[in-house]
């Protein structure tokens, strides 16, 4: 990968769902659970772009290709109030350690702040040391 490739960030669009679905399958494969992905791009288009969408996403783009994603949704706790939950954060291997994951994480954090969320939550598999190191360094 050339060092001067420009990476841009924007909210995901309905037309992005096939590429996002591919990244979700890539993530699930990494997590040793490719069989667990039961949704398809058409369902993602429906559920993510209806009047009250079930999820939102930010994408990282390089040369017109989505190279990273952050999928999230808003939740509510009767104890603590509104929250944003980061469901998936994934960057294709060639673009890791270049600030893409951090930028996507920050986009979700800011979305939570705009909605007056009290907290941001996510989960990491106990064996995924690179992800644990990534989140610890934030």
Predicted ranges, named:
Residues 2-7, 11-18, 22-81, 105, ...:
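Acetyl-CoA-dependent GNAT
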Residues 92, 125:
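Residue-level recognition of the GNAT/N-acetyltransferase active site
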Residues 105, 128-131:
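Short glycine/proline-centered loop/turn elements that form peptide/ligand docking sites
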Residues 123, 133-138:
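C-terminal structural segments of small proteins and small subunits
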